[in-house]
Amino acid sequence: MAIRFYRDYTPGARDRLVVSSSEGTVRFKPQKKLISGFTCRKGRNNRGIITSRHRGGGHKRLYRQIDFRRSKRGISGRIVTVEYDPNRNAYICLVHYEDGEKKYILHPGGIKIGDTIISGPMATILIGNALPLTNMPLGTTIHNVEITPGRGGQLARAAGTAAKLIAKEGRLATSRLPSGEVRLISQNCLATVGQVGNVDDNNRTLGKAGSKRWLGKRPKVRGVVMNPVDHPHGGGEGRAPIGRKKPLTPWGHTALGGRSRKNHKYSDTLILRRRRNS
């Protein structure tokens, strides 16, 4: 995919960069049997309380049912389309399997229309194939990695991301995740060979506030311009500093660098190195 530059004929188009499909392979019309309704929760829970701020609005979407489990074991499939998915920054592929079933998977970088993929323990180490970590050599680049066997891929699913298999010992394998975290994973977990496609997505520049609203993201108001009743940073005369030793969240917890992970979690024993930004 290529990066498209906009001329500054309007303020919104100035400095705007989008990922364009110059090859014409990205399709926007989904498979009808693989879509379902999608209700925007606007960051609210079942009681209507805001649990995730700055969410709401955005364009109406249909959810594409992605096969993160790669459930068609031992049956080869052919890549028919590469499609745009409004629910994620990675593209998706429509796969036609030999038994006639159709499924969506994440688009592995380098896979083209007409290529053949397969999943299962006997799959070869080729881009797009899915197999257990125990059957992969060290140094393999992987994505869509399972945490629990059979639950479906949960790690390294964003556009352009990939994990790396760096060690095996006993029943566990060691992998380096895109965040820099080094984690132990069961060797029975499934992963897909290769990197997620659309690697140029991190170079995208939206260009205007309206583009952010199309994605369902609302404006973020700084706490220092609020009233004291609304935020710990609020209040004061004019442009006053926050008046605290360190920045705080609206609920009084440490912000901007403070640890937010709970202590005494089961997965603490599986994490050998924390993320770079934690």
UniProtKB/Swiss-Prot annotation:
<dbReference type="GO" id="GO:0005762">
    <property type="term" value="C:mitochondrial large ribosomal subunit"/>
</dbReference>
<dbReference type="InterPro" id="IPR012340">
    <property type="entry name" value="NA-bd_OB-fold"/>
</dbReference>
<dbReference type="InterPro" id="IPR008991">
    <property type="entry name" value="Translation_prot_SH3-like_sf"/>
</dbReference>
<dbReference type="Pfam" id="PF03947">
    <property type="entry name" value="Ribosomal_L2_C"/>
</dbReference>
<feature type="region of interest" description="Disordered">
    <location>
        <begin position="224"/>
        <end position="267"/>
    </location>
</feature>
<comment type="similarity">
    <text>Belongs to the universal ribosomal protein uL2 family.</text>
</comment>
<dbReference type="Pfam" id="PF00181">
    <property type="entry name" value="Ribosomal_L2"/>
</dbReference>
<dbReference type="InterPro" id="IPR014726">
    <property type="entry name" value="Ribosomal_uL2_dom3"/>
</dbReference>
<dbReference type="InterPro" id="IPR022666">
    <property type="entry name" value="Ribosomal_uL2_RNA-bd_dom"/>
</dbReference>
<protein>
    <recommendedName>
        <fullName>Large ribosomal subunit protein uL2c</fullName>
    </recommendedName>
</protein>
<keyword id="KW-0689">Ribosomal protein</keyword>
<comment type="subunit">
    <text>Part of the 50S ribosomal subunit.</text>
</comment>
<dbReference type="InterPro" id="IPR022671">
    <property type="entry name" value="Ribosomal_uL2_CS"/>
</dbReference>
<dbReference type="GO" id="GO:0032543">
    <property type="term" value="P:mitochondrial translation"/>
</dbReference>
<dbReference type="InterPro" id="IPR002171">
    <property type="entry name" value="Ribosomal_uL2"/>
</dbReference>
<keyword id="KW-0934">Plastid</keyword>
<dbReference type="InterPro" id="IPR014722">
    <property type="entry name" value="Rib_uL2_dom2"/>
</dbReference>
<dbReference type="InterPro" id="IPR005880">
    <property type="entry name" value="Ribosomal_uL2_bac/org-type"/>
</dbReference>
<dbReference type="GO" id="GO:0019843">
    <property type="term" value="F:rRNA binding"/>
</dbReference>
<dbReference type="GO" id="GO:0009507">
    <property type="term" value="C:chloroplast"/>
</dbReference>
<keyword id="KW-0687">Ribonucleoprotein</keyword>
<dbReference type="GO" id="GO:0016740">
    <property type="term" value="F:transferase activity"/>
</dbReference>
<dbReference type="GO" id="GO:0003735">
    <property type="term" value="F:structural constituent of ribosome"/>
</dbReference>
<dbReference type="InterPro" id="IPR022669">
    <property type="entry name" value="Ribosomal_uL2_C"/>
</dbReference>
<keyword id="KW-0150">Chloroplast</keyword>
